[in-house]
Curated annotation (Swiss-Prot):
Pfam families: PGF-CTERM. The chain crosses the membrane at residues 1011-1033. Residues 1-24 form the signal peptide. The keyword Signal applies. It comes from the Archaea. It is a single-pass membrane protein. One of its GO terms (cellular component) is membrane. This is Uncharacterized protein AF_0946. It is found in: Membrane. It comes from Archaeoglobus fulgidus (strain ATCC 49558 / DSM 4304 / JCM 9628 / NBRC 100126 / VC-16). Its main location: membrane. NCBIfam families: PGF_CTERM. Disulfide bonds: none annotated. The keyword Metal-binding does not apply.
Length: 1036
């Protein structure tokens, strides 16, 4: 790839810089004509070159003139000023046309030999353009550093291509912006395999970059660290743009790179201050509080748009000053520096804080002179080394590890904060003394004590300081070694912050060495044969410390592997505990047993007693009467390993999949065999909770006995010694508990039936409903179905559906019926009917009440109110037809839950006169599918007519009203109320259609019966049915 030697070029550029003229001084123009004073003025000029080696020849190439005389061209003389001093031998003569302003050629040449700051301007004999002064820096640069380009403007905004990175285009929106303005970076890139690296674009200040690039390589890690903005390009091709806003003046380099040798740093832009600005400086210290003897890091930085001198970095306070950097050296000739590192050789210093009093100190950077002077400070406090906390246990158990900790204000040992290097100077030291002052532990003794195996006892009397200022001492088995006597001791801790021991602090604490604690705990002190006892030896000993456990009588646990000898040695865990489990022998004598725990060598022991008693058994059942197929819940408690279940008969009960056997068949003498016998194991709290199922088939109703045993030996029940419990259980058939249904239901209506059962197991049974009555014999109205989770069977009985779909009738006659609920086992279990219950139901004749307002004034509504005893919300087979001269409208009346409906007719546009309202309930038996259309055509059809059976309209209810529609309101209003009680039968010979025409309030009640009364035979049947129902109810 192509690389530009940017470092050398920029160095020359920033040492020789020309500032663009700006209007920021006192004078804005200078007169250069004496004949017409003030009419010919110079207001600006151009200077070249703007860089070069000393000696440097400059040229005032042209000046900007203004002639305000309207008629006369004017001439004058322009003189050169250097550092505010006129150079009389350096001038040019100029002439400007009248009333014009323009640039005119001048051509003053002057050679600069001084390497210090030089101010160049032009003017007359007594004044010059201070406000357009140019600042020119020069230096003794080697010839090779002088760029071979027309100007020293290194700015480059592209576009460029970086072929090695497969970036066809990379450019900047501008090569010079003011601080706070935005530079946009635009890039187009092609595919670049990620295994070859990640392409990045970084924006970095020149002050940092000149130390990042060395020849043909760059330091990628430092570049990423110093980057002001870093962009990562994806593997696939693409394009994008990014904005960067410089916050400090200076040159910025845009570097595209993938590693230390594949990069491009051609793009450069400059950020200039919006006005003349002094340098930006900062200084920092590594910590705000530092102890005497420790080190502190001072870091300083400077950002500037021009080289600066002098530069000083120092620490001061308590009338003491320590200079870290002073630039330039006395007598040295220099133009200034751009960074602290350039001026001082470094920008970070590690300084040891010593030989100074406690107090607050200041680290300071001070740069520049006059109006360009800038400074910054950082404050830190110097304190004496101090132990901030000391944690010594008030009591220490003899033989345990002794741990002593604390904190200090010292830096971490072995860090630059400690010693300026990796040498560890900050340390803490421990000495332990008895009350007489004798040292029982120190740095020397810690290396001289050995245990019984010849190994050195681990301990430390010297501790390094951690990053949080903490220290730690640990002495293994203290009390067993070093201080072997119980009593009080003094721990003395000293800290030291330097290698010479000049800065120290000491703290002491008293603690007591005590004997260990020992407890022996049993989870049960009363046990049964076959039980398990858990013993816990609880100590405050160190892990792996030795304890002994003694069993007074091995008969307690004979057969247990941990019960082979009377005394055993154990070692404590990390909590200082030992856990021992012993199984009580199934034939252990019923007595007390003693157990002892001991710490060897210290004379510390404790004991506990455990009593062996008979097993316990406490059993209860949730019910003693249960249907076949039902379950009995057994709860209680037992100390036995298992509770075994027997019965007085085989084949009646089951536990899970195991049948409960006849106890007599398992008994031989006083022993009962437990093979193939169901049992339940108590939980960890000795509780039992299980179910015993009653079989469905092969079981007769009656009373049976259940036997429960809690044996000490699970292989055999000893009736003489093992606890037992006997419970009597009565087995019944599943039964119907209650049938809930209304005793009276409207004609052709729906009603709810609910059957509550005691099914035993609801999955075993099913229920159906059967209806009997006039012309109906054992008709199934609800097929066999299972009960729900609450043991209910719920069904909606639809009389209209039963008549039409099950009996092929138009309707069930009003009268008395018997609804029977039957309960049986499912067919898979034999289908045996086990219970039934009857419910007497009366189907009522339908009652109609129609109210119509009359007379009605045109403009008011005709309101038809219908009230029935049909409590079927949503029933919509009632039609209302309003008929008059050349007028007919039919509407549908829909009942609410109270059996009521209202229909209204608007009268606007109707003629005054007499109208009739026909209200028809088709009973939903009309033969026509479109009942609305049929009623609209046959609204007048009398249910008693010969044509009515053709349309199955002979069971209809028809009410006819006559109303008067008036032009104007009368003095009174007549309300017509008609109540029609309808008793219907399946054979209709007469139907009364009620027509009422009134001028007064009239109430008419008509019973329209579809037949000539109940025949004698049917009356006898009805009476016989009532007697039969009454008998059945008494039987239940």
């Amino acid at each position: 790839m192509k690389r530009v030697g940017l470092i050398g070029v920029i160095m020359a550029a920033l040492l020789v810089i020309s500032a663009t003229p700006v209007m920021a001084g006192v004078s804005v123009k200078v007169s250069v004509n004496t004949t017409y004073p003030g009419e010919l003025t110079v207001e600006n000029f151009n200077l070249t070159p703007t860089y070069g080696r000393v000696p440097l020849t400059i040229n005032i190439t042209d000046v900007y003139l203004k002639n305000t005389n309207l008629t006369t061209p004017l001439s004058g003389t322009v003189y050169l000023y250097v550092n505010g001093q006129i150079k009389n031998n350096y001038y040019c003569s100029v002439t400007q046309t009248n009333n014009t302003t323009s640039w005119m050629s001048c051509g003053i040449e002057y050679t600069i030999t001084d390497t210090s700051q030089t101010n160049i301007s032009v003017g007359n004999k007594t004044d010059y353009l201070q406000n357009v002064t140019l600042t020119l820096w020069t230096t003794q640069l080697p010839e090779s550093y002088v760029p071979q380009i027309p100007t020293l403007d290194l700015k480059d905004d592209g576009p460029i291509s970086v072929d090695v990175l497969k970036i066809p285009s990379l450019k900047l929106s501008d090569d010079q912006v003011n601080v706070g303005e935005t530079v946009t970076i635009e890039a187009n890139w092609n595919y670049y395999a990620k295994e070859d690296g990640t392409r990045r674009i970084a924006v970095v200040s020149w002050a940092d970059y000149r130390n990042i690039r060395s020849g043909a390589t760059i330091d990628v890690a430092t570049l990423l660290d110093k980057s002001k903005m870093t962009i990562s390009l994806p593997e696939d091709g693409g394009s994008n743009s990014w904005d960067f806003t410089p916050t400090e003046p200076g040159y910025y380099v845009v570097v595209a790179f993938v590693d230390d040798t594949n990069f491009s740093d051609v793009l450069v832009f400059r950020a200039t201050p919006t006005a003349a600005e002094k340098p930006t400086v900062s200084i920092s210290v590594s910590k705000s509080v530092v102890a005497l003897g420790d080190y502190i890091k001072v870091g300083a930085s400077m950002s500037t748009d021009q080289a600066v001198k002098p530069i000083a970095v120092f620490i001061t306070g308590a009338n003491q000053t320590e200079v870290l950097c002073s630039y330039p050296e006395p007598g040295a000739s220099t133009v200034g520096a751009w960074t602290v590192k350039e001026a001082c050789g470094d920008d970070e210093w590690w300084i040891q804080i010593k030989d100074r009093p406690e107090g607050v100190y200041v680290a300071k950077i001070d740069v520049g002179e006059g109006e360009l002077r800038a400074e910054a400070t950082a404050v830190f406090q110097v304190v004496k080394p101090k132990i901030l906390s000391l944690d010594v246990p008030s009591q220490h158990v003899k033989g345990q590890d002794l741990v002593i900790t604390g904190t200090t204000n010292l830096a971490k040992s072995g860090t630059e904060d400690d010693s300026g290097s990796n040498a560890a100077e900050n340390k803490a030291y421990l000495v332990i003394k008895d009350l007489s002052g004798k040292e029982v532990f120190n740095d020397t003794l810690s290396n001289q004590v050995y245990d019984s195996t010849g190994g050195k006892v681990k301990s430390n009397a010297v501790s390094l300081i951690d990053s949080d200022g903490s220290f730690k001492f640990k002495i293994d088995y203290f009390g067993k070694y070093f201080a072997t006597e119980t009593g009080f001791y003094i721990a003395e801790v000293k800290i030291q912050s330097d290698s010479l021991g000049e800065y120290t602090d000491t703290e002491t604490a008293t603690f007591e060495v005590v004997k260990p604690e020992l407890k022996l705990i049993a989870d049960k002190t009363t046990v049964t044969r076959g039980d398990t006892v858990t013993f816990t030896i609880d100590t405050n000993l160190k892990i792996n410390s030795e304890v002994k456990f003694k069993i007074d009588d091995l008969a307690f646990c004979s057969g247990d592997p941990d019960c082979d000898v009377k005394e055993k040695t154990y070692y404590v865990d990390a909590l200082g505990d030992v856990v021992i489990k012993l199984d009580v022998n199934t034939e252990a004598p019923l007595t007390d047993y003693k157990f002892t725990a001991e710490i060897p060598g210290l004379g510390i022991s404790t004991d506990i007693r455990v009593s062996v008693v008979k097993q316990t058994l406490d059993i209860s059942v949730d019910r003693t009467t249960v249907p076949r197929g039902g379950d009995i819940r057994v709860t209680g408690s037992s100390t036995a390993d298992g509770v075994y279940i027997y019965a007085s008969d085989s084949g009646v009960f089951t536990v899970g999949d195991t049948p409960v056997p006849d106890v007599d068949l398992k008994t031989k003498g006083s022993k009962i065999n437990t093979t193939d016998v169901p049992y339940m194991e108590p939980d960890d709290n000795d509780n039992i909770d299980f179910q015993i199922s009653v079989n469905v088939t092969g079981v007769e109703t009656g009373t049976y006995y259940l036997y429960f045993y809690a044996p000490a030996n699970i292989s055999v029940v000893d009736k003489a010694s093992d606890p037992q419990k006997i419970i009597a259980v009565t087995v019944t058939d599943p039964q119907i508990v209650e049938v809930t249904a209304p005793s009276k239901v409207p004609y052709q209506s729906k009603f709810e039936v609910s059957v509550l059962t005691d099914p035993g197991d609801r999955d075993n049974v099913e229920v159906r409903l059967v209806l009997s009555g006039p012309n109906v014999r054992d008709t199934t109205v609800a097929d066999w179905a299972s009960v729900d989770t609450n043991n209910y069977f719920n069904k909606t009985v639809d009389l209209r559906d039963i008549a039409k779909n099950k009996l092929n009738l138009d309707a069930l006659e009003p009268g008395l019926y018997v609804l029977t609920a039957e309960l049986r086992f499912k067919q898979s279990l034999g289908g045996e009917k086990v219970d039934s219950e009857d419910k007497l139901i009366e189907i009522l004749g339908l009652t109609f009440e129609v109210d119509v307002n009359t007379p009605v004034v045109i403009g008011d509504e005709i309101v038809v109110n219908i009230t029935t005893d049909r409590l079927e919300a949503g029933y919509d087979k009632i039609f209302v037809t309003l008929v008059g001269t050349n007028y007919k409208v039919t509407q549908v009346a829909t009942l609410n839950s109270e059996g009521k409906a209202t229909v209204t007719f608007e009268t606007y546009g109707m003629s005054a006169g007499t109208y009739k309202v026909y209200v028809r309930d088709t009973m939903d038996t009309c033969s026509e599918t479109d009942q609305y259309t049929w009623v609209d055509e046959h609204y007048m059809l009398d249910p008693a007519s010969e044509l009515a059976p053709m349309y199955k309209a002979d069971d209809d209810v028809l009410v006819i009203k006559t109303i008067e529609l008036l032009e104007t309101a009368p003095t009174t209003t007549t309300v017509v109320t008609t109540t029609t009680a309808v008793t219907t039968t399946t054979v209709a010979t007469t139907t009364t259609a009620v027509e009422t025409t009134t001028t007064e309030a009239v109430t008419t009640t008509t019973e329209a019966q579809q037949g000539g009364g109940v025949p004698g035979f049917e009356a006898v049947f009805a009476i016989a049915g009532l007697l039969a129902v009454a008998y059945l109810l008494r039987r239940k």
